[in-house]
Amino acid sequence: MTKPIIGITANVRPNPAHEDINWSYAPSGFVEGVQRAGGLAILLPVSDPSEAKTYISMIDKLILIGGQNVDPKFYNEKNHASEDDFFLERDIFEMALIEEATKQKKPIFSICRGTQLMNVALGGSLHQDIENHWQDKPSDYLYHEMIVDENSKLAEIYGRGTSINSFHHQSIKHLASDLRVIARDPEDNTVEAVESNSPDLRFLGVQWHPELLLDKREEDLKLFEYVVNEL
């Protein structure tokens, strides 16, 4: 049986030993999650947006990973966040990937920044600087609770309520019209997961980091299994 080919967006950072040499990379949990779920993982490096069509044609599904803030110019705002952490070329390339994946009817799964970017690409906006959602605990520590819509695939995996890790200081503000919220933080109503409500788009996005919880609990591996084999 042919394994699904899952394209994982890559980030860029300096090599710690040689800061004049950059690395294209994705955290290994994304690759491990795809592999353990039965898929083949391919990294998609930040590239010219004209190459998005070819990249998407090579894969069966797309995963948008975390990283920098989404440049607020894409939702018609000026930056007023406490950090100036942007990567414009990455935003542009990944928006081209989203557009092509939608055209080619390839499912999309997103995590953290990826979910924020998806919302912006579809016409939504972001809270630029929120509090109490960047934990100072180990990455697999379950930091706060989450309430899940009972009429969602997430509820089949996690139940109506669970706890999640949290590493973000931006979140969805105005929701894109093609999306619906399927999970929130019960304390402050922060959006923690969304899915497509459009028949033309197969999409699931989460705000937490299941790739860091693969050895912590089975639900997060089941999420990757759903993405790789069913989404």
Say what each PLM segment does.
Residues 1-111, 131-142, 147-157, 169, ...:
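N-terminal beta1-alpha1 cap of cysteine-dependent amidohydrolase-like domains
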Residues 166:
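Short, basic/aromatic recognition patches
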Residues 125-128:
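Short, well-structured active-site flanking segments
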Residues 204-207:
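Active-site-proximal beta-strand elements of phosphoester/diester hydrolases
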Residues 110, 114, 119, 123:
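Gly/Ala-rich beta-loop-alpha elbow adjacent to hydrolase catalytic centers
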